[in-house]
């Protein structure tokens, strides 16, 4: 019997509700699921702690992780790098935990190549206006960042069909 965990990739536009979904899964099923903590070069938001929400890295530290093969996938998003550390994911799967990766479309495409059995889910808001409301409602980004995230969402929407996603609207 194989007790290896399932790799679940949750993607979606910034502001689609990925973080909320993940928090509810972990609250409801704490012994069955774990979330991968990504590395990033973006600055921490208020209340975020290194190693909990993200591993916050300098650009040079992140580039070293790329060069030494420490990341399963990585991508640049709105001027910052994001990536998934390999060791933690593999340890959780071997321990029988279902591991959730909250990553963008490009990363999901790369994960599916490396882990063909991974389950891919794409979370989207019901309308573009709702997405903008959610981004503004956070109160964590300036106008330029909100506009960049909305522009990126438009680009990502065009790439969703290239990956075998299950689509979820919240």
Task: Enumerate the predicted regions with their spans.
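Hydrophobic anchor at the beta1->P-loop junction of P-loop NTPases
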Residues: 10
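P-loop (Walker A) phosphate-binding loop of NTP-binding proteins
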Residues: 13
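Walker A/P-loop
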Residues: 19
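ATP-dependent NMP and nucleoside kinases share a basic, alpha-helical "lid"
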Residues: 84-138
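Conserved small/polar residues in nucleotide/adenosyl-binding loops
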Residues: 166-170
